[in-house]
């Protein structure tokens, strides 16, 4: 059991929750940095985490939140301010002399350079943030996951699956090795629990399978017991829909780029990095659907099952 404190930023995010839970179960002290006090923060506090509220764009608040911590897990949702936030956290970590800085990046970065980039401003900022961290001299571990099941199907696709039995995405026949946010969180926890062997290393994290969206639809069908179909949405219609719902411009450009990269088969990659770090295989597509079946099940069907029991 470690008496040192580990700081986890983005405490309300999909990876951070599992990271915090795992570390607490192992007896580590965890400080969760959140943007505001809400139900998610209450849950983390009930689990045993220390809660601190700080804006990552406020370097003074970030440094105060990090005071007394031996390691940092930096994770942040998609934001036009990502590079500034990551720099603030890195500057504070350098000033305070943390012994490990675990950075949650993106797998696309492994195919980027100053001459090879993408159209996504988010991916560009991830690449720049990694350059900054390398120059910083901090003891960094780089986690680069592929796309998440959670964002693909819970945030974007759940309504279409639940109400219309369809997955609508502009990926054509491109394959993607989706990973669960909880698995990424487990990988981060494994590194934070014993960071020394991992300092300076890069881990590209993929899921168990690399499948087309039509094949993912088959996985949904098998678990849910009804036919789920994949509809390949033309890119221009996809872009129009994104703008119609008035998503932030930064996010729209990122999603458009992800669509193109999937059509180009850039997400068809497999590694065993997760197995190396955690000691088990990442969860399958079918297992992800089972764990979140309620999100993909029509309300009437859920009610009838509850009544029958």
Task: State where each predicted segment sits.
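Oxidoreductase cofactor-interface core, primarily capturing Rossmann-like NAD(P)-dependent enzymes
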Residues: 2-43, 57-60, 64-69, 78-87, ...
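Cofactor-binding loops of NAD(P)H-dependent oxidoreductases
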Residues: 54
């Amino acid at each position: 059991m470690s008496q040192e404190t580990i700081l986890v930023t983005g405490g309300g995010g999909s990876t951070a929750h599992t990271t915090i839970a795992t570390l607490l179960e192992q007896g580590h002290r965890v400080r969760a940095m959140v943007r505001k006090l809400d139900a998610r923060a209450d849950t983390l506090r009930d689990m045993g985490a220390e809660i601190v509220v700080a804006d990552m764009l406020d370097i003074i608040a970030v440094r105060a939140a990090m005071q007394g911590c031996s390691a940092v897990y930096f994770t942040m949702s998609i934001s036009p301010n990502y590079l500034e936030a990551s720099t603030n956290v890195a500057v504070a970590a350098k000033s305070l002399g943390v012994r490990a800085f675990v950075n949650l990046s993106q797998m696309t970065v492994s195919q980027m350079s100053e001459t090879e980039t993408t159209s996504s401003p988010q991916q560009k900022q991830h690449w720049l943030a990694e350059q900054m961290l390398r120059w910083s001299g901090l003891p960094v571990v780089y986690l680069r996951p592929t796309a998440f099941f959670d964002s693909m199907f819970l945030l974007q696709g759940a309504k279409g699956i639940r109400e219309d039995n369809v997955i609508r995405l502009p990926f054509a026949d491109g394959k993607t090795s989706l990973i669960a946010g909880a698995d990424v969180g487990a990988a981060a926890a494994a590194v934070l629990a014993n960071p020394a062997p991992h300092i300076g290393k890069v881990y590209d994290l993929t899921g168990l399978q690399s499948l087309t969206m039509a094949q993912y639809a088959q996985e949904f069908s098998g678990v849910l017991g009804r036919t789920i179909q994949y509809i390949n949405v033309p890119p221009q219609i996809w872009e129009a829909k994104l703008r119609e719902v008035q998503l932030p411009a930064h996010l729209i450009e990122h999603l458009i780029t992800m669509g193109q990269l999937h059509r180009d088969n850039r997400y068809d990659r497999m590694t065993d990095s997760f197995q190396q770090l955690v000691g088990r295989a990442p969860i399958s597509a079918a297992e992800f659907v089972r764990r979140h079946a309620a999100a993909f099940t029509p309300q009437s069907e859920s009610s009838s099952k509850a009544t029958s029991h």
